[in-house]
Design a protein with these regions (language model features):
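Residue-level recognition of single "structural anchor" positions
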Residues: 1-228
Length: 228
């Protein structure tokens, strides 16, 4: 709901990368191998000398060019300068009309530098988004609704410097009025726990030794119904 279909694409210098929402999967190659976590594309405007402009976030099918190039073209204006790492999924950006600058993580490691410093803006936004999901929502976000949560984060982040709360509220109402109605039961469909019948506790019997009478110990005899 918090995404305007006609919003302007990012321009100027834009950093683009991907991250896992849910943490990296151990044993998978790099940050592109698929697992149970959700791969998310992030694009962030870089403002000189040191600043961050707007951002965009969207779920990706995988880390291939078939997913990454449409993400960039949907969220970054033509003729913008796009900065990425050296992943081969971005190699077609120049053909789409972007000034593409690649920064190699392998070369950074060889120089003893931190690879995260190659794309500082996009990594900062990714860290803020994950912290927001873990703190505000306690990490209780279903994958089916993750894009809606990311849209909310982007809406808040892009208006973090707004001085008019009234205009922000007006924008929320405007977007809500132009969105199709969403019922609560549609949001929670498929997330309800299954109803199961309670299992009665197992009946404990007495030890077999209590069934026989021991001389001098009548209390060890088997219990008989009271006859009055």
């Amino acid at each position: 709901m918090l995404v305007h279909q006609g919003r302007k694409r990012l321009n100027g210098t834009v950093e683009v990368d991907e991250t896992y929402i849910g943490g990296e999967e151990p044993g998978l190659a790099g940050g592109r191998a698929q697992g149970k976590n959700v791969l998310t594309g992030i694009a962030v405007e870089v403002r000189e000398p040191k600043g961050i402009g707007r951002c965009r976030m969207a779920l990706l099918e995988d880390g291939s060019a078939a997913s990454l190039l449409p993400f960039v073209s949907d969220h970054v204006a033509p003729a913008a300068t796009v900065i990425t790492d050296a992943w081969m999924g971005y190699h077609g950006l120049a053909k789409l009309g972007y000034a593409h600058r690649r920064r190699s993580q392998r070369a950074a490691r060889a120089r003893g530098e931190d690879p995260a410093a190659l794309l500082p803006a996009v990594h900062r936004v990714a860290s803020l988004a994950k912290r927001w999901l873990l703190s505000t929502h306690q990490g209780a976000v279903e994958p089916a609704h993750l894009q809606s949560y990311l849209d909310e984060f982007v809406f808040r982040f892009n208006r973090r410097r707004s001085r008019s709360r009234g205009m922000v509220f007006y924008r929320v109402l405007e977007l809500a009025a132009g969105h199709e109605p969403v019922r609560y039961r549609n949001i929670t469909a498929g997330n309800k726990p299954r109803k199961t019948s309670p299992v009665p506790p197992a009946t404990r019997g007495h030890p077999p030794s209590l069934d026989r009478v021991t001389a001098g110990r009548p209390w060890r005899a088997a219990h008989l119904p009271y006859s009055g």
